[in-house]
Amino acid sequence: NLDLKKRIEISNYAISNKNSTETFNISSNVDNGYSTGGFIEGSVTPYSKQLYKSIGFKDIQVKTLTLDSVMESLKITRIPYLVKIDVEGAENIILDGALKFINKYKPILLIELHSPQNFIKTYQLFSKLNYQINQLHSDNENRTFIYLSPITKLEQNKLIKDMQLFLQIQKYG
């Protein structure tokens, strides 16, 4: 699609939780059923690093930047409305480096989570950020697909009123 080509920029770095150099585990064999190609060190993966090495994964060093630092360096002309995150177990690594961006722009997020611990951490984080969390799909490989949207002030006020009404009913029976 030539129209999309004008709006896409390919950059030679990985998004992470720090501006640094990190180990990236990569495989050229994406058809073996173990991965879609690679993951950054610290990702929550279904198998041990030793297993990945035994099937041909190699360690390479990659430049990493936070999404916050990337967004600060870009000249944003359109506010991001939707962000999709599918990063093979590095969801919370990415999110840790994107908090300023998320707080400033309040985008809708579609995230594929790769473990129960990532689901819990993501739920805790976005509950504090006043996001509504909806599970779209879950499969038998510990992957959960979620949709997160910011709760508006109007929705917050309605939730508070509903909770106050609930507490009154409980108190007075």
Regions found by a protein language model. Name each.
Residues 1-173:
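Phosphate/nucleotide-binding beta-alpha loop and adjacent structural elements of enzyme active sites
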